[in-house]
């Protein structure tokens, strides 16, 4: 089961144009978002360390997302 709250994930799908969403679809998207988010976070940590920082900044996240 995904750790992300399901309601916001459902809103993301609704904002994309869906009228109805199954619980399985919400869970599947939440799982994928968590996996991708963790990949981006790990890359952002590497970028911050490379820059000599312990703090991950928004720019690290943005660069990591573009890189992946």
Curated annotation (Swiss-Prot):
Keywords attached to this entry: Chromosome, Cytoplasm, DNA-binding
Region (Interaction with DNA): 20-22, 54-57
Listed SUPFAM superfamilies: Histone-fold
CDD domains recorded: HFD_archaea_histone-like
Entry keyword annotation includes Cytoplasm: yes
Family annotation (Pfam families): CBFD_NFYB_HMF
Signal peptide limits: none
Residues with site note (Interaction with DNA): 14
SMART domains the record matches: TAF
A molecular function (GO) term: DNA binding
Keyword set includes Cytoplasm: yes
GO CC aspect terms: chromosome; cytoplasm
Compartments in which it is found: Cytoplasm; Chromosome
NCBIfam families the UniProt entry points to: archaea_histone
Family per similarity comment: Belongs to the archaeal histone HMF family.
Function: Binds and compacts DNA (95 to 150 base pairs) to form nucleosome-like structures that contain positive DNA supercoils.
Subunit structure, interactors included: Homodimer or heterodimer with HmtB. Dimers then assemble into higher oligomers, with the DNA wrapped around the protein core.
Name the record gives this protein: DNA-binding protein HMt-1.2
């Amino acid at each position: 089961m995904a750790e992300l709250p399901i309601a916001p994930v459902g809103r993301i799908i609704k904002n994309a144009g869906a009228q109805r969403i199954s619980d399985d679809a919400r869970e599947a998207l939440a799982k994928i978002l968590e996996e991708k988010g963790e990949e981006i976070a790990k890359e952002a940590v590497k970028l911050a360390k490379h820059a000599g920082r312990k703090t991950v900044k928004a720019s690290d996240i943005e660069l990591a997302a573009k890189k992946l």
